[in-house]
Amino acid sequence: MIDSIKKLFKPVQLSIILLSFAACVSQNTANVKTVGESKLITDIITSEDAQSTIVTVKGNVTLTYTAIKQELPLGLLVDFPETALDNIKTVYYPPENDTLNSIRATQLEEEGVTSRIFISLKQDFSYSLQPDDTGLHIYFSKTDSPAV
């Protein structure tokens, strides 16, 4: 009887080890996310034309956003829910201009990932938002007098 138990012990032990290994492998692969599933902010660019100073937030897909104008500190706060930053500078100082002081990008990871961009303004300018397939264009009007 002891001999038959000894003969069964090694196959049972080997089976337990293999099942444990298989369970670990399947758990790890279930948690993997591909980059294609994530919304990313890939760049922040500033430009100017005769009428506007333009901040362009580029993404790998169409970006969902909420924009709130702030008085203290003066600027525009733009939140991008379920969107991460993709290796971009977190603080940007544009070339000398009459509109923008700086642009700061942060990634918040409370209750999911949200990216926040704060555009610090020198004066209270009117603005407009124009989303497209690759991001968001924010136009600060130069031709209007600063908002009061």
Over which residues does each language-model region extend?
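Bacterial N-terminal signal peptides that target proteins for export
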Residues: 2-14
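Bacterial N-terminal signal peptides
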Residues: 12-23
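Signal-peptide-cleaved, periplasmic/extracellular N-terminal interaction regions immediately downstream
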Residues: 2-5, 24-148
